[in-house]
Amino acid sequence: RIRVFTHSDVSVDAVLASACLPFLFQAVEIDGEFFWDGGYMGNPPLYPLIYHCDSRDVLIVQLNPIRIPELPKTAQAILDRVNTLSFNSSLMREMRAIHFVTKLIDNGFDDDGRLKRMLLHTVDAEDVLSRLGVSSKLNADWDFLTTLFNLGRERAEAFLVQHFDKV
């Protein structure tokens, strides 16, 4: 089951659990329950923002590519694609839920004002990230991390230039 840690629930253990990949680390115990990376079930948990956030705008920083042009042919490439699909599936599910709520609102149902229209914005580097293998997620080389950091800055600046007035 998904647990979204909020406010006072956010602790060092909650952050460790959120980053805990099950094939690399053991689950983290919090209040007698065990948790590991939410990427498999709720990454990111957008739907709670409908009820618990004053802002209508949500900015998604897309780390996993959605479209990868190459067809995987080797066992490792297929396993990598399964990994990417697994992590993207929860985001796609959350986005479908937001779209569903938008349709409800468009049809006049807002659950007595509890539902709100969400505006999703995305910053991505899919053209670059789609060429990196899944193993790059474990690459802690400083030069590689600096390259990703700089790429993120470039894409964020480009997003702001193009879309600042829409946020």
PLM feature spans:
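Active-site glycine-rich loop that binds ribose-phosphate moieties when present
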Residues: 12-24, 38-44
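Non-catalytic peripheral regions of patatin-like phospholipases
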Residues: 5-10, 33, 39-167
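Carboxylate- and glycine-rich phosphate/diphosphate-binding segment that chelates Mg2+/Mn2+
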Residues: 1-6, 24
